Amino acid sequence: MIYRDFKGLKLSALGFGTMRLPVKNGVYSDIDEEKVAEMFSYAIAHGVNYFDTAWGYHEGNSEIAVGKALSAYPRDSFYLATKFPGYDLSNMGKVEEIFEAQLKKCGVGYFDFYLIHNVCEMNIDAYLNEEKYGTVTYLKKQRENGRIKYLGFSAHGDLGVMRRFLDAYGKDMEFCQLQINYLDWSFQNAKGKVALLDEWHIPVWVMELLRGGKLA
């Protein structure tokens, strides 16, 4: 396994995403936890130490399955990432409720990496309205308290949306997860987004390298 240094951490260059886990009878919400445990065991044995989940994956069950699978390993042997689901505007104003639930679902006391999920045209105004929702303020407080080790964001919006977000919160963001592949380098202007993040000295995490297998 190739590893990358991030603030002294040794992160596997290949992470394990959990948006498309094995399911039973084709039901997206019914995760096959036995198969997930087998997959995690294989990945860990081959050097993977970064696992990524999110509130909405598998209709809310991904975090639970991930927590169960990782409970077999020492907490300091892996890095766990999840996300605040601001892509659903009904979640704005519920950051504390959701964060506490995520800790319980994953069975952990802290998250190594926590992302503001899918900053885009639909939610940028809500994310910027700290007076009303206080999302970023709350998450920064959890970082201060050690319940989030590193705070970042993922983005599917256009370059202008990302620029607005960074103008407000760039100094607080420690990494960004972007959809990068040979199609989206130009189609979603990943090239321009990477250049903007470089100006802010924010490292990039790559997602959707094969667009869910569609580019394989």
Predicted regions and their residues:
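Active-site mouth loops of central-metabolism enzymes
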Residues: 20-34, 83-93, 122-128
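N-terminal binding-site loop/beta-alpha segment at the start of enzyme catalytic domains
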Residues: 1-78, 138, 144
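Short, acidic/polar
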Residues: 29-43, 91-107, 157-168
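Active-site groove signature of glycoside hydrolases
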Residues: 104-126
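Beta/alpha (TIM)-barrel catalytic core signal, keyed to glycine-rich beta->alpha loops juxtaposed to Asp/Glu
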Residues: 119-216
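A short, structured active-site edge motif that brings together acidic residues
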Residues: 76-88, 114-117
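Conserved, mostly hydrophobic/aromatic
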Residues: 14-16, 43, 51, 66, ...
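Acidic (Asp/Glu)-rich catalytic clusters
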Residues: 7-10, 45, 67-77, 100-109, ...
